[in-house]
């Protein structure tokens, strides 16, 4: 029987966290928890209800009435109160404002509690900005992914084109730099590498190379 460890993968926007985490979870037959999708879902409910992204109390009130759940599949489905929001939470409107919503302490605290419940049984791969430091500080394996702004903008540009979104590469670079600033400098649970996390610079690596490196590290933890 495979030992059910918890794997935390953190890093800045477009560092490849979600793609790699999905591959690792599938290979290990673990559950993948996309915490970024949870923050995007909250941003979407603010948008849908015409609530200002800066209005922490109003968004928190909405969140208290909101059920966010995941449904496994070839592409993991995300539901908000039984509405399938898998695609809409990746819209440019949500993408450009999720860091504002994610900076609210009340929202981070509420979602961190939900994320910790998901992890109680182990056998999970969770990616985000503060998994190794705040959500799963006792995770058996912590990874911190890095990549240059140029590399991350190029990846996001290709993703957007594949989804049919028009994109401007220079604008994407600017947006990623702004998002980095918000993520690294927010007061509550900022993006930072846990002391015991293993840093992986993915700038010159393929997705499979990154996934295989993490799988190798995971196997060592599982066998210990």
Swiss-Prot record:
GO molecular function: ATP binding; CMP kinase activity; dCMP kinase activity
Pfam families, A to Z: Cytidylate_kin
Alphabetized CDD domains for the sequence: CMPK
First-level EC class: transferase
Taxonomy, superkingdom: Bacteria
E.C. code: 2.7.4.25
GO process annotations (BP): nucleobase-containing small molecule interconversion; pyrimidine nucleotide metabolic process
Record field: catalytic activity: CMP + ATP = CDP + ADP; dCMP + ATP = dCDP + ADP
Gene Ontology CC: one annotated term: cytosol
Subcellular location, principal: cytoplasm
Binding locations of ATP: 11-19
Localization: Cytoplasm
SUPFAM superfamilies: P-loop containing nucleoside triphosphate hydrolases
Keyword annotations of the record: ATP-binding, Cytoplasm, Kinase, Nucleotide-binding, Transferase
Recorded family membership: Belongs to the cytidylate kinase family. Type 1 subfamily.
Protein's UniProt name: Cytidylate kinase
